[in-house]
Design a protein with these regions (language model features):
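Short, glycine- and charge-enriched coil/turn segments that flank and shape catalytic ligand pockets
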Residues: 25-31, 105-114, 141, 179, ...
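Residue-level signature of catalytic and energy-coupling elements of molecular machines
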Residues: 50, 95, 131, 160, ...
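Radical SAM enzyme [4Fe-4S]-AdoMet core and its adjacent flexible, acidic
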Residues: 104-121, 125, 172, 233-266
Length: 325
């Protein structure tokens, strides 16, 4: 604080429910009251942050330093917010946290995510629940069977941030719990054979050799994710990885990213082509501005903002409507 005198007010992340009062007090104004969240992400879908912070110690990540350890929000509070968002028109809630499978552990809950989903299932008007993100360490058959049995409310589309596939690199990343990503994927597909999987990967982590990258690329080609994101490693100041030797040149990082993204583009195209001639529910989000009978939406394996959109033709469709097309 002393080193940043230009900062007028520090607001702890754990006290977000008090930010309004604190800001008003700092400005010498009265606080009008009311803490209902306003839906700003679109008329059909909303993000619901279920926890703050992270208990994992990945060496490339600064989030635990910035946001502290896991701090789960109470179920009652989340159900109230969910009800408010649905009342404003949201039909899909995207549960977000650094690790949604970890939800409730700091509150002494053994099956926190399951309890939360069961509580949210009572919210009238809610059609879909989507989970972002499931850390590999939390992926087990007990949870997967629950998610399978919670369909169609919980869509069988999961983002599992693996970050890499080679066990040596995963260990160097501080992710020994994820040393066998093949096993993680096999566990999911054993319980949910039709699940859509997406992941995020880091290329060019310090010490990543050509053999490590070739292993990762083969993994992507064999697993065939519906979608994935690839990020060149960035040396975040204050993280252990930033001081590691064997830093990979930027040009090599970018080239490796392009190679995997090229592989994934072909995989995603093949998966989408396999959907031709099938019917599935489309969550309508908005009309096309140029064609009055064309509407933009998403199917169950398309997460908001990152996995593309689906267009459906019709008359008088409304945002938030589920259309079987």
């Amino acid at each position: 604080t002393a080193g940043l005198p230009e900062v007028d007010l520090w607001l702890p992340l754990a006290e977000q429910d008090q930010w309004g009062e604190r800001l008003a007090q700092a400005l010498g104004r009265s606080f009008p009251g009311g803490r209902e969240r306003i839906l700003t992400t679109g008329p059909a879908s909303a993000y619901l942050k279920i926890s703050e912070g992270c208990d994992h110690a990945c060496r490339f990540c600064i989030i635990p330093q910035l946001r502290g350890p896991l701090q789960s929000r109470p179920i009652e509070e989340l159900v109230r917010e969910a009800g408010s968002l649905v009342a404003q028109g949201a039909r899909e809630l995207v549960l977000v946290a650094q690790d949604v499978a970890n939800y409730g552990q700091d509150l002494g809950m053994r099956q926190g995510l399951q309890q939360l989903v069961e509580a949210l299932s009572a919210v009238t008007g809610l059609d879909w629940i989507r989970l972002l993100y499931l850390y590999p360490v939390g992926v087990n058959k007990e949870l997967l069977r629950f998610l399978r049995d919670s369909a169609p409310l919980v869509v069988p589309s999961f983002d599992i941030p693996l970050q890499h596939a080679h066990p040596d690199i995963l260990t160097q990343m501080g992710r020994p719990f994820a040393r066998d990503p093949y096993r993680v994927i096999a566990t999911v597909r054993d319980v949910l054979p039709q699940a859509a999987l997406r992941t995020s990967l880091i290329v060019g982590y310090p010490g990543e050799k050509e053999a490590h990258f070739a292993y990762l690329r083969q993994f992507v080609q064999e697993v065939r994710f519906h979608n994935l994101g690839v990020f060149p490693y960035y040396a975040e100041e204050g993280t252990p990885a930033a001081t590691l030797p064997d830093q990979v040149p930027e040009a090599v990082k970018n080239d490796r990213r392009e190679q995997i993204m090229g592989d994934q583009a072909q995989i995603s195209e093949t998966i989408l082509e396999s959907c031709q001639g099938t019917t599935m529910d489309v969550l309508v989000e908005r009309p096309d501005p140029h064609w009055p009978t064309l509407f933009q939406g998403r199917v169950w394996f398309q997460a908001p903002e990152v996995d593309g959109v689906t267009y459906v033709s019709g008359h008088g469709l409304q945002a938030g409507q589920l259309v079987h097309a």
